[in-house]
């Protein structure tokens, strides 16, 4: 019978390989897990380095670039990137098509050129002002040429101010666009030393940048066009308002009209005198009296109040705008001829003297009591 200690030792010797085999599997699993941990750690370090790029100083970034460019594996890295690019560039090659110009931007450009804001300054503002003045006058003569000249110069001055602001803002826009484009192009050229970037891709990126900036340019041109249209509308409205007679001219014409209600048809000599005093033409005087007679007949009540007002003014004192009144006789209802008068200046009725009244020169030949019962 053998010694148990020898058998134990022998058994231990036999069991040893089995125990060694199990520990080998455990060591392989541990080595694989260690590799995974190491890979994750490396990825984490790479991500940390990428995140720290934005915090690096310019000197540190230049040092890292120099280290990368001098690395012995840099050509291999560039070759791999070129292979990847050849595979991916085929899918995006067909998407790079030329886009037509924006029609809205073209319309804005044409409008700014027509208004004399864009393009070379060749009197475009003056031409626009002249056309606006002609459209506002509508074929009628201006009442005050000096005022029209002043307004015309104001329009051109404001249009020149709009033009100046537009060109200043456009210059700022173009400067910002050029600076940003130059920065991106330099950045892409710098990156082309590490990754493959073709000149066509750089040109494509420039086009994308200009398209982004075109929205700012469109807003600038749109606001400028709106400012020009507002200026034109205000100028045209002002021109239309100037077609009305001045207060002095209205006073002269109304005073003559109500002083001659018996025969509100001024002679050619009177029209010329009125036109001279009012600073208007004879045809405008004729048109005014024609319109005044129609308005008086349609609204006799309101016209009667206005007639009383002018009669009171004349009773208080002679107006500086007044002309010579009628030679004699009292007024009669509107649109009726004056009745015949005798040698004493009294109206003659069919049956002789009709309510003989002395002639009141203070009223200018007009008695408001005779027109209280007039019907339209």
Swiss-Prot record:
Give the molecular function GO annotations.
cis-regulatory region sequence-specific DNA binding; DNA binding; DNA-binding transcription factor activity; DNA-binding transcription factor activity, RNA polymerase II-specific; DNA-binding transcription factor binding; protein heterodimerization activity; sequence-specific DNA binding; transcription coactivator activity
Gene, per the UniProt record: exd
Location(s), subcellular: Nucleus
Q: Where is this region: PBC-B?
A: 127-237
Name recorded for this polypeptide: Homeobox protein extradenticle
Where is the segment annotated Disordered? 1-37, 318-376
Cellular component, GO, one term: RNA polymerase II transcription regulator complex
Query: Compositional bias (Low complexity) at which positions?
Result: 318-335
Q: Cite the entry's keywords alphabetically.
A: Developmental protein, DNA-binding, Homeobox, Nucleus, Transcription, Transcription regulation
Tissue/organ expression = Prior to full germband retraction it is ubiquitously present, after germband retraction, mostly present in the anterior portion of the ventral nerve cord.
Query: SMART domains annotated for this entry?
Result: HOX
Which stretches of sequence are listed as region PBC-A? Answer: 45-124
Q: Quaternary arrangement and interactors, per the entry?
A: Interacts with Ubx and hth.
DNA-binding residue intervals: 238-300
Q: Which SUPFAM superfamilies match?
A: Homeodomain-like
As for what it does, the entry says: Transcription factor which acts with the selector homeodomain proteins altering the regulation of downstream target genes such as wingless (wg), teashirt (tsh) and decapentaplegic (dpp), thus affecting segmental identity. Delimits the eye field and prevent inappropriate eye development. Required for proper localization of chordotonal organs within the peripheral nervous system.
Q: Name one GO biological process term.
A: regulation of cell fate specification
Instruction: Name the InterPro entries for this protein.
Output: HD, Homeobox_CS, Homeodomain-like_sf, KN_HD, PBX_PBC_dom, TALE_homeobox
* Disulfide-bond pairs as recorded: none
> What main location does UniProt list?
nucleus
Alphabetized Pfam families for the sequence: Homeobox_KN (PF05920), PBC (PF03792)
Q: Please give the knockout or disruption phenotype noted for this protein.
A: Weak posterior-directed transformations in all 3 thoracic segments and in the anterior segments of the abdomen.
The PBC domain is annotated at 38-237
Instruction: Say which family it is in.
Output: Belongs to the TALE/PBX homeobox family.
């Amino acid at each position: 019978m053998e010694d148990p200690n020898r058998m134990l030792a022998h058994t231990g010797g036999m069991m040893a390989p089995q125990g060694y085999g199990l520990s080998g599997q455990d060591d392989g699993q541990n080595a694989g897990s260690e590799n995974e941990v190491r890979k994750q750690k490396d990825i984490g370090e790479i991500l940390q380095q990428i995140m720290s790029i934005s915090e690096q100083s310019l000197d540190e970034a230049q040092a890292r670039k120099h280290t990368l460019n001098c690395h012995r594996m840099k050509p291999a890295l560039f070759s791999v990137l070129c292979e990847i690019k050849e595979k991916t560039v085929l899918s995006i090659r067909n998407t790079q098509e030329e886009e037509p110009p924006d029609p809205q931007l073209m319309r804005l450009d044409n409008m700014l050129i027509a208004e004399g804001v864009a393009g070379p300054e060749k009197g475009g503002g003056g031409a626009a002002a002249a056309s606006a003045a002609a459209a506002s006058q509508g074929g009628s003569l201006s009442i005050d040429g000096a005022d029209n000249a002043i307004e015309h110069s104001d329009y051109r001055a404001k249009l020149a101010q709009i033009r100046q602001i537009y060109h200043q803002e456009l210059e700022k826009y173009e400067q910002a666009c050029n600076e940003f484009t130059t920065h991106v192009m330099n950045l892409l050229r710098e990156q082309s030393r590490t990754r493959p970037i073709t000149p066509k891709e750089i040109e494509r990126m420039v086009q994308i940048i200009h398209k982004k900036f075109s929205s700012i340019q469109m807003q600038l041109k749109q606001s400028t066009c709106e400012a020009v249209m507002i200026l034109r509308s205000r100028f045209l409205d002002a021109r239309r308002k100037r077609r009305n007679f001045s207060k002095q001219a209205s006073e002269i014409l109304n005073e003559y009209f109500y002083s001659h209600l018996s025969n509100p048809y001024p002679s050619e000599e009177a029209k010329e005198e009125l036109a001279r005093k009012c600073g208007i033409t004879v045809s405008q005087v004729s048109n005014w009296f024609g319109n005044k007679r129609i308005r008086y007949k349609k609204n006799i009540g309101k016209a009667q109040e206005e007639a009383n007002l002018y009669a009171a003014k004349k009773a208080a004192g002679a107006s500086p705008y007044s002309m010579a009144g009628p030679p004699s006789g009292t007024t009669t209802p509107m649109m009726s001829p004056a009745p015949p008068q005798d040698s004493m200046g009294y109206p003659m009725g069919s049956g002789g003297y009709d309510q003989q009244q002395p002639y009141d020169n203070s009223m200018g030949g007009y008695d408001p009591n005779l027109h209280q019962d007039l019907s339209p």
